[in-house]
């Protein structure tokens, strides 16, 4: 079952007099439950592709369908609702709210969804336990290591069991041991909960864990490999 379908995507950014074509006629289908990495050099279009799948960037031309919804015909309010209920984001820089504790950061999405306080707290505790942060519920981001902050970010992304998690360079600021632990945790969630994970990455380890590796160059899809020997699959 397709959960993402991109057809002939084009995206151009303009910075002053400079025009950069980030995506060029890119087409890609992703099935529910995939664990997929998008690789390529800087400027190849990886982050742009994730942002467009997440409805954060407008499409110049082409079409994107996510979980049965055609993004280019949706209003900003409809896109925000899709992100809130169907898509989890993990950012390279964590993007945690510094004045909130770990558990409050995780609860925030559910607060926007209108869940009762007791249910929010129970779900947030459970998912923080799942990512190895039991007992650190009340720590603020500045009191956590980089690896712990990224685990809070993952917990926030998956607490509502989204259909898709989009992870932009999730291991870039982590040492190899912490990065491996994070990947194993997300791989387990993919297997157990059937959450679709889509990564953008330069990290060879992420590519090794992925069950499918898509490569971009100059905004074009240049390779698409399904792997039978991904790490710990």
Where are the language model's segments positioned?
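ABC family nucleotide-binding domain
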Residues: 2-216
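ABC-family P-loop ATPase nucleotide-binding domain
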Residues: 1-12, 223-233
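H-loop (His-switch) and adjacent beta-strand-loop-beta switch element
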Residues: 213-226
């Amino acid at each position: 079952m397709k959960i993402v379908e991109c057809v002939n995507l084009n995206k151009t950014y303009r910075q002053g007099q400079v025009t950069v074509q980030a995506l060029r006629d890119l087409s890609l289908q992703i099935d529910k439950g995939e664990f997929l990495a998008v690789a390529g050099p800087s400027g190849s279009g990886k982050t742009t592709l994730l942002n467009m799948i997440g409805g954060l960037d407008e499409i110049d031309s082409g079409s994107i369908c996510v979980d049965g919804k055609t993004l280019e015909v949706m209003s900003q309010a409809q896109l925000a609702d899709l992100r809130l209920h169907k898509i989890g984001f993990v950012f390279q820089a964590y993007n945690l709210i510094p004045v909130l504790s770990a558990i409050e950061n995780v609860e925030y999405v559910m607060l926007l969804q209108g869940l009762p306080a007791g249910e929010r707290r129970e779900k947030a505790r459970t998912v923080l336990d799942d990512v190895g942060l039991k007992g650190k519920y009340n720590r603020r981001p500045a009191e956590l290591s980089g690896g712990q902050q990224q685990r809070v970010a993952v917990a926030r992304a998956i607490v509502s069991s989204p259909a898709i998690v989009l992870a932009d360079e999730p291991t870039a600021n982590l040492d190899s041991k912490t990065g491996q632990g994070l990947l194993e945790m997300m791989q387990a969630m993919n297997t157990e909960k059937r959450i679709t994970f889509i990564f953008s990455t330069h990290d060879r380890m992420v590519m090794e864990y992925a069950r499918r590796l898509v490569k971009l160059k100059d905004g074009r899809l240049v390779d698409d490999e399904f792997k039978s020997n991904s790490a710990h699959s």
